[in-house]
Amino acid sequence: MSAKINSKKLEMFDLLKKFIDNKQNLFFLDYRGLSVSQLTDLRNKIEGEHGALKVVKNNIMKMVLKEKNINIVDSCLVGPTVVVTALEEANVIAKIFYDFVKSSTLKVKGGFVLGEFYDEAKVQAYSKLPTKKESISLLASVLKAPVSKLARTLKALADIKN
């Protein structure tokens, strides 16, 4: 029976290892009090933005993180835990689960973003950053403003001469 348990744990270890392979962004959430349908809804929203959500066993996750040399605060792996990964824009994923926090019992424990541990407050601040698309739009409008002003000035000058 012991061999059966160990093989299951080893299989779970390998699955979690593959789950976080090549991921630079990990978030740890406490899903206590969420219904299955709420968790499924959260998972669908996260997957819609190129992220993934997995319910994990804390001890096995600790071993995986240790093997990957990822250092996080132990409190991130206490109680019911889901790990959320982001393939692209991690702050978009963070916005999704912070929107979810407002209407549910979901709690953010912390995260690991681009090689640095983020506590709950840092993850929340990170979630408020503009997305890549919003940043590009803002930059475009900033670059466009002087050109538009010059065009209006030249048009006004031409109107005065006529």
UniProtKB/Swiss-Prot annotation:
Cystine pairs: none
Superkingdom assignment: Bacteria
GO MF, one annotated term: structural constituent of ribosome
Pfam families for this protein: Ribosomal_L10
GO cellular component terms attached to this protein's record: large ribosomal subunit
PROSITE patterns assigned to the protein according to its UniProt record, in alphabetical order: RIBOSOMAL_L10
GO biological process annotation, one example: translation
Keyword Manganese appears in the UniProt entry: no
CDD domains: Ribosomal_L10
Keywords of the record: Ribonucleoprotein, Ribosomal protein, RNA-binding, rRNA-binding
UniProt record similarity statement: Belongs to the universal ribosomal protein uL10 family.
Subunit-structure text: Part of the ribosomal stalk of the 50S ribosomal subunit. The N-terminus interacts with L11 and the large rRNA to form the base of the stalk. The C-terminus forms an elongated spine to which L12 dimers bind in a sequential fashion forming a multimeric L10(L12)X complex.
Function: Forms part of the ribosomal stalk, playing a central role in the interaction of the ribosome with GTP-bound translation factors.
Protein name: Large ribosomal subunit protein uL10
Gene: rplJ
